[in-house]
Amino acid sequence: MVKAIKMKNTFSLLITIVFCCQISITHAQYTDVINSNRPGSSQSAFSVGTKVLQFELGSYLVKEKRNVYPNYEVSGYGLDFAVHYGIWKEALELNIQGTYQNDTKSYSSGVIKDETRANFKNFNIGAKYLVYDPNKNKEDKPNLYSYHANRGFKWSSLIPAVSVAGGLNFDSEDNPYTATTVDGVSYRGVLITQNNFAGGWVFVTNFMLDRIGSDQTDLNYTLTLTHSFNPKWVMFAETQGIKSDFYADNLFRFGAGYLLGKNLQLDTALTFNTKDTPSVLNISFGVSYRIDRHDTSN
């Protein structure tokens, strides 16, 4: 009963925050080419654009090794996916996100029986809303009198775009990737910021409170820095921190994306950590595709 009241109050708070942020936004960052969240794990502050349907799909190989008791190794593969659809004045986006993993957990002692595991590590249905865009109704005009002013650092770029996101998590009973008491529906809340700097640099932060109302509430932060070298290639570096009673880690990612067409991107990334309880090494490959029926009338 107490748990149900806690979940209800948390959900009401999230709804209140979203409705308090109903600011009219007429400018957003729809782009002529696809702007995927892959291959990083953070999400952009901006919607994909009104009436734009975007698919993001990746596969990865996972290797984990724990060198202290109970010693074990994990090897397997996984799939992560996301679907985004933009509606209402470019500011609101609906999305579905998830990660499915299949692996074998082998214990070196021989006393504990090896495990074959398969389930969703997470599955979420939610929405994202652009609360503040520093470039709203602003046209960045070149300085006709100063070459250095056009090429130099713009202090206004330090003010980030801000979004809030929320959603429902769905966890099944006896899921090996969650605490044993976690099942059913819980909530997610995310604060997102994004700075677009000159020279093709973008800095994104995500601060997430996940599985709110369950026995495993996760605190998660992700910091992502991307750089476009040319219209085709983008590189990124990312750090992700995870903290809960069930699992804690600090992950690092490096990767690249290649624009194969205006609506199609390929990507790859390497993920690792610096501890041995367990050590983590993942390599991923992915693709992003959008159906662009962008409508500026909404």
Stretches with model-predicted labels:
Residues 1-34:
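Bacterial Sec-dependent N-terminal signal peptides
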